[in-house]
Amino acid sequence: MDDMQQLKIIIEKHSDGYVAYPVGINGVIVGQGDTYEQALTDVQSAIRFHLDTFGRDSLTVEEPVMEAFVAEASV
């Protein structure tokens, strides 16, 4: 990737490993791994594959995510 773009990545810890995905990008880009680092590396690889397949315009976000929060709510 010549023109690097900073993306916010959510990494969730589950009982069977970690799942990672970028915030604010249309389409399904997911990484997974047994560790935090493996999930992050896997999602970075998935993003590169997405770019190679669909082009940089596929990552264009109309309004970049400034911050991401995790909250709990009773329903």
Range-by-range predicted roles:
Residues 17-20, 35, 68:
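Intrinsically disordered, low-complexity N-terminal regions enriched in serine/proline/glycine
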